């Protein structure tokens, strides 16, 4: 299956090369980005020669030294060789200082290196020089997230939960390109649900221990058509991750449906529970960096389900909610679903980040602390 994915990534590079020749640079480099990000995953699995060949295919297709340097910097960025990436993009800028996308990559590399003032200056200059370039505004949100939530990103925290719990069963709602689903360990039966991405042809990642079971359905249709116990081959799941439709009412439905198959010590993780700014939490997407209004689920659960243990881990880019002490027999949320949705949709997202931290029940981004709450090594009640 990994060879299939590497072959698919090779074809994606060829498609991006064609787009680039046709003049569609945005689509071309969007495609390159996805490929280079995925290649780092496979390089980490020991497929260094194969990933290098795919990277070379993209590099050799570049029509000028400037574009070759840009592409090289992008590869180094995704391999996390940030100092070398900065050197490459600075060399490209020396050749073509008027190209906005070069400055944008420079700002991203500066962010990764921890030079937040330098990155802020870079993106601010882009906004002044090229107001039509929407990526600068989104990058400023990323910068703010880096400042407010330093340290590991949510993929790192997902990996921690897999390491702590070593789940026999893992259910993921909303797959993206498959990166989080591929974190499942060798003894985990992984199940992925997504109406658009629930096909191997649309994913870029596959678990090295064996492919997950995919369901190309909405989560509502999945739970209506399938008994999760039969799909898992067991009565309960160990770890669930909700990252589907970014609307409060859907996240709440997904939580209700998952909890019916939970044990008390099962854990449900919910992405996008700490928006970096109110505008990214709008119900209708108006920014590239977007969380939707999933944040509402945290105060909702705190109010209607005081029996649950809940916290939001302040991890970039948009927080990770974590819930345990679950009760499969509880019907409180389902019984009051309409009134809950009506009430919580009337609330505004707090303007200040410190206010959002309180409303979203933000805890400490400390591995020992979080493990103590959600992996059973202690019996904390202080959340």
Roles of regions detected by a PLM:
Residues 2-241, 245-269, 273-383:
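A short alpha-helical cap/connector motif
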